[in-house]
């Protein structure tokens, strides 16, 4: 581990030096000296030197407006380079990700050593593996795509420099390339000028597929196959690909008026176009590789006389022609041209699969397995994973939009107002209409624009090739009628298949009622007939934590899942739980392995479906090697959770969690909802108002333009508190509740829960990670610089609470300091703090200057505004998870 730290530190220091030279070349010695002085003061301040801390504050307060941007950019770019170095070190031979594929081997060995598990049972568990990762464009991916590409190249240089055998001239060439890349980054604006459109976000998702997943997925499957052969003597069937990718980019219209039916239609076409583009490159390689002559009679019959000379090439060239024709047609459609469908248009995965698989079988039968298992096998696996749609999309819409559409319709038909009916009346109407053979929508009806949009979206789903849309997610779902309403709207659009419709339960009350809602639905005969034994339910992490605090929310999520698993098991329904986690702790983020093993027993039987959000996509799938590592971690965790499920918690543990939940929720809401000073404090102590100026995502920060904390989306709420380092949403209420239970004499019981119950130990581990990233002196500095003195007591109270919380968490976990069992992460946080601290101090200063100008009725200085945006991006890089 120490070797890993020192290798990381020396790379970070080397990159910092190159950045320093770049700054000196661009802006002169005096700016570099200023940056170096600040860095040294920050390092000394971190080591506990109070005089230097004071000097750091004074130096940053006294920067002239001309110095603000260069200093902010220097520390922000440094953090991007540090993250790149860390990403490289995680996949370098000494790093943690390099050992992650080993996770599969370790898991298989662990499972084989369990006397109650036969090899056959383990094989069956492997065969039922299912992992669906849903990529979402959260506005927290702050780094521009342009800079991400440069950082990928920096990573490649670090990898080559690690090779001890390279010649001096090669070493010098690589160093020159590094200098060029860092100079290019320095001279590139790190802040987007315009908000991305939903189509831009979708293209960002396709870039992740092309640059990383396309190679990463086949590599992961080779790794998995190797471990299975070695440990179980079992070969993965060619058609077995347990991982799929879905996207919300272009499909998630919840609170985002920019995602329309036309946008979704466009993104579906664009996704298919990108798939043809990537498969064409694969097929081109196969045309040149598969020059073999010998083939089975079956393959020769397939190609006929015309193709007998080079049967494999003949099939590949045919497939290439079909792909080219499909691509040309899609291109015309994207330009708005209406062309007749060409002959051989590819719409189904089977059409790609069959010629490729015919070649594979023939090569195997003719003793050319070594060739079959090369590029051809990788392409076959890509067909199974990505296929014609490349990534499927989910549609997500808020429940009230469907209710309003049906209300408008029933009023027009003169049969009453659906919106004001009781739940029983709504259900009776919906079931009657779902069973009816006549259409419900009148031909000459002219609905409002909002309702038209809901109906048009259903039309897009009905017209899309089957398999290109994965599920319809209903956010803020509360009742059975919310689910039935979507089925009725889809039926009216003429959908010819049963589309999975997933209610998303996301507030504390909705999570507590989730099981009742699903029980009622499963008691409806028509509904049981429709779903054919399969149900997806989405669990919301971010909104429940914002509603009730992290402790109450996580217990409600656990209980909702637990009850749903038991209800579906009893009813003979295969349940897929869809987890809407974020990258940050306040939105349910946790290291994958720990998070999965902390769920209720049986929660992964129907596979894992989970959102991968914004900035976390780059950290977990930004390079093919990291993709292999992340998928291996998930695989190991799913196998372990299904074959060695965590124990059912004792009744006394459940009672303690109930108690913790009530106490923490009361305290959290007491501050956030009931304390009259809280909202003014939040608005002034964090850059919440300024965040709205950042052109981050295509979606507005608020569900409604006015209103307090409750109208804010969960992401800006978390993002704002991460910026001022108080990290409040991720801990408020939790420690106080633990302290109360300790005072009631139950510390030994809490310690047992921490030892023996993965759910509870993961909660404590997540709290420790938050506390390690929080910084009370910085939070206090924001107060002093930005907050009205009358509100200072509230800030002090919150900081004191955090100090007490840290003590109680360490006492229960029996640790002397935070992150004792994860030294690698603790080291990484410490390394970045030296560069993040100056950005925090500078941000408080910039907010002060900007708000002061506004108070005096002046336009804020553009240099101040630009530097402020850079500090927001830089702190996000330093914290490694934004919202």
Curated annotation (Swiss-Prot):
Superkingdom of the organism of origin: Bacteria
Top EC class for this record: lyase
GO MF terms held by the record: magnesium ion binding; phosphoenolpyruvate carboxylase activity
Cofactors demanded by this protein: Mg(2+)
InterPro entries according to UniProt: PEP_COase, PEP_COase_bac/pln-type, PEP_COase_Lys_AS, PEPCASE_His_AS, Pyrv/PenolPyrv_kinase-like_dom
EC number: 4.1.1.31
UniProtKB keywords: Carbon dioxide fixation, Lyase, Magnesium
Entry GO CC: cytosol
Active-site residue list: 138, 546
Gene Ontology BP term (one): oxaloacetate metabolic process
Catalytic activity: oxaloacetate + phosphate = phosphoenolpyruvate + hydrogencarbonate
Family: Belongs to the PEPCase type 1 family.
Described function: Forms oxaloacetate, a four-carbon dicarboxylic acid source for the tricarboxylic acid cycle.
Annotated protein name in UniProt: Phosphoenolpyruvate carboxylase
Recorded name of the encoding gene: ppc
């Amino acid at each position: 581990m120490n070797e890993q730290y020192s290798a990381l530190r020396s790379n970070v220091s080397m990159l910092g030096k190159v950045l320093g030279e770049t700054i000196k070349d661009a802006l002169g010695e005096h700016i570099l000296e200023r940056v170096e002085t600040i860095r040294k003061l920050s390092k000394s301040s971190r080591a506990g030197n109070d005089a230097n801390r004071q000097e750091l504050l004074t130096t940053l307060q006294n920067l002239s407006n001309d110095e603000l941007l260069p200093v902010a950019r220097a520390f922000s770019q440094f953090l991007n380079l540090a993250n790149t170095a860390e990403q490289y070190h995680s996949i370098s031979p000494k790093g943690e990700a390099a050992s992650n594929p080993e996770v599969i081997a370790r898991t298989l060995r662990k499972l084989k050593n369990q006397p109650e598990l036969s090899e056959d049972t383990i094989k069956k568990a492997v065969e039922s593996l299912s992992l669906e990762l849903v990529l979402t464009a959260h506005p927290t991916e702050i780094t521009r795509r342009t800079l991400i590409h440069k950082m990928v190249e920096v990573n490649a240089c670090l990898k080559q420099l690690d090779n001890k055998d390279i010649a001096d001239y090669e070493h010098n060439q690589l160093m020159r390339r590094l200098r060029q890349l860092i100079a290019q980054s320095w001279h590139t604006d790190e802040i987007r000028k315009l908000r991305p459109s939903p189509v831009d976000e979708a293209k960002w998702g396709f870039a992740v597929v092309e640059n990383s997943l396309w190679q990463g997925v086949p590599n992961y499957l080779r790794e998995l196959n190797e471990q299975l052969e070695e440990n179980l003597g079992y070969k993965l069937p060619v058609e077995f690909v347990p991982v799929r990718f879905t996207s919300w980019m272009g499909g998630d219209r919840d609170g985002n008026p920019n995602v329309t039916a036309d946008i979704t239609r466009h993104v579906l076409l664009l996704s298919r176009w990108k798939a043809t583009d990537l498969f064409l490159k694969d097929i081109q390689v196969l045309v040149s590789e598969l020059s073999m002559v010998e083939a089975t009679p079956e393959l020769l019959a397939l190609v006929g006389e015309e193709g007998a000379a080079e049967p494999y090439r003949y099939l590949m060239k045919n497939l290439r022609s079909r792909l080219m024709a499909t691509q040309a047609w899609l291109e015309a459609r994207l330009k708005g041209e209406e062309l007749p469908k060409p002959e051989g248009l590819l719409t189904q995965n089977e059409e790609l699969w069959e010629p490729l698989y015919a070649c594979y079988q023939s090569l195997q039968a003719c003793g050319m397995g070594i060739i079959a298992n090369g590029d051809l096998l990788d392409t076959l696996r890509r067909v199974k994973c990505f296929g014609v749609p490349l990534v499927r999309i989910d549609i997500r819409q808020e429940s009230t939009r469907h209710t309003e559409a049906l209300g408008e319709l029933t009023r027009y038909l003169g049969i009453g107002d659906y919106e004001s009916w009781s739940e029983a009346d709504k259900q009776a109407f919906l079931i009657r209409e779902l069973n009816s053979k006549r259409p419900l929508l009148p031909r000459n009806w002219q609905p409002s624009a909002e309702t038209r949009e809901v109906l048009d979206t259903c039309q897009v789903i009905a017209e899309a090739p089957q398999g290109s849309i994965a599920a319809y997610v209903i956010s803020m779902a509360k009742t059975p009628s919310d689910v039935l309403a979507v089925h009725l709207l889809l039926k009216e659009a003429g959908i010819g298949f049963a589309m999975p419709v997933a209610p998303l339960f996301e507030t504390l009350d909705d999570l507590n009622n989730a099981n009742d809602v699903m029980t009622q639905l499963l008691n409806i005969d028509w509904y049981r007939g429709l779903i054919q034994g399969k149900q997806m339910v989405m669990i919301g992490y971010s909104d429940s934590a914002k509603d009730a605090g992290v402790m109450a929310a996580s217990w409600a999520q656990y209980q909702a899942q637990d009850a749903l698993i038991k209800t579906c098991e009893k009813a003979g329904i295969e349940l897929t739980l869809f987890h809407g986690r974020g990258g940050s702790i306040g939105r349910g983020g946790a290291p994958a392995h720990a998070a999965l093993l902390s769920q209720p027993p049986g929660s992964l039987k129907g596979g894992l479906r989970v959102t991968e959000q914004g900035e976390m996509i780059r950290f977990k799938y930004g390079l093919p090697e990291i993709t292999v590592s992340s998928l291996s971690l998930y695989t190991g965790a799913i196998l372990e959770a299904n074959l060695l499920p965590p124990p059912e918690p004792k009744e006394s543990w459940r009672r303690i969690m109930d108690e913790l939940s009530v106490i923490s929720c009361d305290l959290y809401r007491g501050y956030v909802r009931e304390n009259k000073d809280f909202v003014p404090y939040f608005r002034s102590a964090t850059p919440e108002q300024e965040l709205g100026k950042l052109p981050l995502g295509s979606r507005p920060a608020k569900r409604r333009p006015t209103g307090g904390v409750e109208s804010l989306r969960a992401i800006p709420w978390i993002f704002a508190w991460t910026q001022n380092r108080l990290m409040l949403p991720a801990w408020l209420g939790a420690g106080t509740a633990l302290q109360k239970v300790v005072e009631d004499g139950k510390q030994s019981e809490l310690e047992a829960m921490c030892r023996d119950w993965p759910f509870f130990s993961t909660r404590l581990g997540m709290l420790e990670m938050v506390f390690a990233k929080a910084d009370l002196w910085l939070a206090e500095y924001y107060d002093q610089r930005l907050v009205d003195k009358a509100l200072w007591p509230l800030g002090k109270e919150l900081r004191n609470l955090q100090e007490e919380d840290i003590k109680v968490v360490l006492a229960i976990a029996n640790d002397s300091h935070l992150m004792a069992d994860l030294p690698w992460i603790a080291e990484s946080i410490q390394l970045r703090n030296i560069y993040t601290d100056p950005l925090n101090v500078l941000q408080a200063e910039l907010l002060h200057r900007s708000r002061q100008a506004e108070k005096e009725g002046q336009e804020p200085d553009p240099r101040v505004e630009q530097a402020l945006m850079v500090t927001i991006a830089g702190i996000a890089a330093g914290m490694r998870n934004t919202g």
